Amino acid sequence: MTINNRKSHLKDLDPGLMKDWEIAEKAEEFLKPSKMLAEELGLTEDEIIPHGKYVAKVDFAGVLTRLKDRPNGKYIDVTAITPTPLGEGKSTTTMGLVQGLGNLGKKVTGAIRQPSSGPTFNIKGSAAGGGRSQCLPLSPFTLGLTGDIDAVTNSHNLAMVALQARIQHEANNTDEFLSSRSLKRLDIDPARVELKWAIDFCAQSLREIIMGIGGKTDGYQMHSGFGISVSSEVMAILSVFTGLADLRERMSKIIVAYRQNGEPVTTADLEVDGAMTALLLRAVNPNLLQTIEGQPVFVHAGPFANIAIGQSSIVADRLALKLADYHVTESGFGADIGFEKFWNIKCRLSGLKPDCAVIVATVRALKMHGGGPKVTPGAPLDPAYTTPNAALVEKGCQNMLAHIQTVKTAGINPVVCINHFAADTAQEIDIIRRTAEQAGARVAVSYHWANGGEGAAELAEAVIDACNEPNDFHFLYPEDMPLRERIYTIARKVYGADGVSYTQTALEKLARLENTGNTQFMPSCMVKTHLSLSHDPALKGRPGGFTLPIRDILTYMGAGLVVPVAGDIKLMPGTSSDPNFRRIDIDTHTGKVKGLF
């Protein structure tokens, strides 16, 4: 099918009348085979690993070696204002911008994270985008893709298997017996096990469990629990590793527990690190998919931004930047958490420098931040969000200004994308445009949900202009800044906090880290709610006068991250009373999946 024929067909797909999965099903009749997509990118046949006709993995190491002397393309991050619980269309905007740049004749790629089954079957959906700006094929993308998250889950849980077995065998056997198995007693403290089990669902009943209750042959009775797979340190490692040797070294450093004398127990101590790495071998290569309009999209790694690093992989971005003139990557949630981690973690570890950041804003979210009624997933929107209310928008723009300031603090050029909804009025949009421009940002109104790449023309042109303008990219803090000062700097300059407080648990862990000095050069990966600039999801707008409470500090030695946990946020989300799985099914005649979004 020619490009013009494909465009003509896509124009018949009306998001106002069709569900996302219905649009995807029709558009998938005209997908480019992965082989064609790879050829257009400049990949050789031996650099792609097909997974069916429309999904492939790409040998990143081979491509990077072949293209090591090729200059990088322009590097664009898509972030957002603080969202409502419904999301503001950041993934949709990412796909729309990729399509918009492609529509202008640019060689462009995108990169997004693999969706977790947790939100897919719960509330938020698959993060494939929506309307006429989606990542396809939808069902494989949404339902496990090539098994990367399963590999992460299995690798993580193998460490737990090794740890639990070691505790049991040391409890049941003498030193002489252990020695006969070439084992040295590790003397693990069951009360100081750092690791939990992993599962890729939202399962609140598994947050805290008692295990090993059957007897001596059934394990060691102890308190444990589960986190969602995408919060695993193994997933963070998949996001930040730069090559197989780096991956192997990182997998050996994961701290799983502490000994009775306070020394850490690592995956290397359990002799499980090699096997854990082996489980990841097929997951290390990025997955190649495409937009509805046929531009290439790399999908790799899937950590959340509120409870993890919130970025697709470094290797996917490095790969794409060698293949394209413009590469659009996405960081999770708002600029306070997703972009901050892109800025101070991903770019620091990768050595890559962005040219531009797109901040997605909606009239709906700004009304919420201006004092609008509560937005609840599954419940009808209050009329305040579907009828004109310029005053709410004007007041809510304070939240947008905070995110613009964060991007400008990084020294790069912000572009505010007003993601257009049908109920938006010209007056409301003018308020957002005027406020953002006065703050030094470019502004574009984008209709990509309704019109695909053509609807993102203004956005694409604004991004090109921003990328062509010089910038002064720099990090928020030097890598040797003391940990307490680093946490304070993020809290003050990004969140707007007056100060930071610590629980006794956090203070004790902080003191141990400061005494060892092991974390001096490790970036801070903050864990906090995505629903507010603060730690409290109820505080909307641009809150001030608050103290950021750090209740715990986790140490991810393998990923090379210190993880301060702010407020009451959990590493295992819960499933709602009206989850998406109620609406997902198959067509028994065609074998296709219905109800995904």
Curated annotation (Swiss-Prot):
Record's InterPro entries?
A: Formate_THF_ligase, Formate_THF_ligase_CS, P-loop_NTPase
- The protein's superkingdom reads Bacteria
Give the record's pathway.
One-carbon metabolism; tetrahydrofolate interconversion
Keyword Cytoplasm present in the record's keywords: the answer is no
What is an annotated GO biological process for this record, any one?
tetrahydrofolate interconversion
Keywords assigned by UniProt, alphabetized: ATP-binding, Ligase, Nucleotide-binding, One-carbon metabolism
Q: Which GO terms describe its molecular function?
A: ATP binding; formate-tetrahydrofolate ligase activity
Question: What PROSITE patterns does the record point to?
Answer: FTHFS_1 (PS00721), FTHFS_2 (PS00722)
Q: Which reaction does it catalyse?
A: (6S)-5,6,7,8-tetrahydrofolate + formate + ATP = (6R)-10-formyltetrahydrofolate + ADP + phosphate
In short, the EC number is 6.3.4.3
Q: Which Pfam families match?
A: FTHFS
Where does this protein hold ATP?
T84, P85, L86, G87, E88, G89, K90, S91
| Entry-linked HAMAP family | FTHFS
**Protein name as annotated:** Formate--tetrahydrofolate ligase
Q: What is the lineage of its organism?
A: Bacteria, Bacillati, Chloroflexota, Dehalococcoidia, Dehalococcoidales
The gene it comes from is fhs1
